[in-house]
A protein has these predicted regions:
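Hydrophobic ligand-binding cavity/cleft-lining segments
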Residues: 1-47
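Short, highly charged C-terminal tails/helix-capping segments
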Residues: 38-44, 144-160
């Protein structure tokens, strides 16, 4: 299993605000969050209590364009959300956001888990060819900028 993790401290907002934003995000809000990089993010199919929601997202991470559907496979309100990536079939890839409130704001841990369990782990070295050091660096820089920018947006919405 390949794990790509970035921790970002964002002042002035809460974990609940981050999770709520992600659960209710529209294409317009996503594009405003990072114009030209965030292209689309919206819920296609909503489930009771949001577990199982199907979303579509389209964005650039560095020079790579990532277009996927994602299904919420885990949700802890105000704390954690996990999407499993889907591209025709469920992929062995998950995007996790873990949020923890602190005295001045929230710490967001952005984690991508890519790979197989059990016997499928033998295929992980092939995945590692796609997930090289350059992508790891781009993803880390991306998450740092992205969540600081989200903090600015959520603060602006709050102060209206």
């Amino acid at each position: 299993m390949i794990t790509l993790k970035t921790e970002v401290a964002v002042q002035g907002i809460t974990a609940q605000q981050v999770i709520d934003f992600m659960l209710n995000c529209t294409d317009e809000e996503y594009q405003r969050w990072w114009p030209g990089t965030h292209l689309a993010f919206h819920t296609i199919q909503r489930q009771p209590r949001d577990l199982g929601n199907l979303v579509y997202f389209d964005e650039y991470v560095g020079k790579r364009r990532l277009k996927f559907h994602g299904m919420i496979t885990e949700l802890v309100p105000g704390k954690r959300i996990v999407w499993q990536m889907i591209k025709f079939i469920k992929l062995p890839a998950w995007l996790c956001l873990d949020c923890e409130d602190g005295p001045d704001g929230v710490t967001i841990t952005h984690t991508m888990l890519i790979g197989f369990t059990k016997i499928g782990r033998l295929l992980d070295p092939l995945l590692a060819l796609y997930i090289n050091k350059g992508f790891k660096k781009e993803l880390d820089q991306y998450a740092q900028f992205e969540f600081h920018r989200l903090g600015e947006i959520l603060l602006a919405l709050e102060t209206g």
